[in-house]
Regions:
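Gly/Trp-centered helix-boundary motif
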Residues: 1-83, 87, 95, 109, ...
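Residue-level recognition of transmembrane alpha-helices
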Residues: 2, 59, 101, 117, ...
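Transmembrane alpha-helix boundary and packing residues in multipass membrane permease domains
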Residues: 5, 87, 116-121, 144, ...
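Short helix-capping/hinge motifs at transmembrane helix termini and TM-loop junctions
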Residues: 12-20, 90-94, 119-128, 201, ...
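Generic hydrophobic transmembrane alpha-helix motif, especially the helices
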Residues: 46, 77-82, 90-91, 96, ...
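Amphipathic cytosolic juxtamembrane alpha-helices at the membrane-cytosol interface
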Residues: 54-69, 93-101, 161-165, 169-197
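Amphipathic alpha-helical segments that mediate coupling or scaffolding at interfaces
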Residues: 60-63, 67, 88, 122, ...
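Glycine-rich helix-loop "coupling/hinge" segments at transmembrane-helix boundaries
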Residues: 119-122, 144, 202, 209-248, ...
């Protein structure tokens, strides 16, 4: 299911029947069209349309692009940062290890959403609103990545403590290999399996975090398609009869996260 969604989002221009962000293909006359199986529904809009007359199916496919881009990029950033700190802490030890682990423990007490909100708030205080809107995706990637790295650091450190006492590491030291080469050429490949497991789970959490931030209005700007943004605007019409504007993006997000 995940690869089907990924394929559709990458080739949205081919898969989606409409481009919902092209003014020429959107008409307000089509606004609030219900799904095809409901009274008043049309086959040209299988899942109905939103308040702007945009096809819901096409909008969700285009919106999943941002969620997947932010999810993948933020997890890669968190994995690089966390693995680097975890391996070096486990291999070097001493005060450096204590500092890294205490920092990890402190951050793990803070929920990821709150940490991402904090980083986003700091970014808004430093740069102008216009610049923030232009760099919203990069701010989101950094904010979510900063909130997710401790899990990678703890797993990497624990695995490194086991690996550094094995014979191949001792042999590498004897032949004069540098610590950097030992850590990232010999130890890292042997601890990748648990790291990739954490990354798989973290990707789903990153996508949900991005959608949550966009739903709260602190993620991508309203002009940028995102599943969280779609749910946010559809929420205004949930109890006025146009339930499909929120329902389908929410179901799509759940399926994407679980897949």
């Amino acid at each position: 299911i995940f690869f089907i969604i990924l394929f559709c989002s990458v080739f949205a221009g081919i898969v989606a029947p409409y481009n919902p962000f092209d003014p020429a293909s959107v008409s307000l006359m089509d606004a609030f069209t219900p799904p095809v199986w409901s009274e008043g529904g049309r086959f040209s809009f299988i899942l109905g349309t939103d308040q702007q007359g945009r096809d819901m199916f096409s909008t969700m496919i285009y919106g999943s692009r941002i969620s997947l881009i932010v999810g993948f990029a933020s997890i890669i950033f968190a994995m690089i940062l966390g693995v680097f700190l975890g391996i070096t802490a486990g291999y070097i030890g001493g005060r450096y290890e204590i500092i890294v682990m205490r920092l990890t423990d402190v951050q793990l007490t803070i929920p990821s959403i709150l940490m991402a909100l904090l980083v986003d708030g700091i970014a808004r205080a430093i740069i102008t609103q216009t610049m923030h809107d232009e760099m919203a995706i990069y701010v989101l990637i950094f904010a979510i990545g900063i909130s997710e790295w401790p899990q990678f650091a703890r797993v990497s450190r624990a695995s490194t403590l086991v690996e550094k006492n094995k014979e191949y590491v001792s042999a590498s030291r004897i032949i004069g290999l540098s610590n950097i080469l030992i850590m990232f050429k010999h130890i890292l490949p042997n601890i990748l399996r648990p790291i990739l497991v954490i990354a798989t789970i973290g990707l789903a959490l990153a996508i949900i975090t991005e959608s949550t931030l966009s739903f709260l209005g602190v993620g991508v700007p309203p002009t940028t398609p995102s599943l969280g943004t779609l749910i946010r605007f559809g929420n205004n019409f949930l109890f006025s009869g146009e339930w499909w504007i929120t329902f389908f993006p929410a179901i799509f997000l759940i399926v994407l996260a679980l897949s």
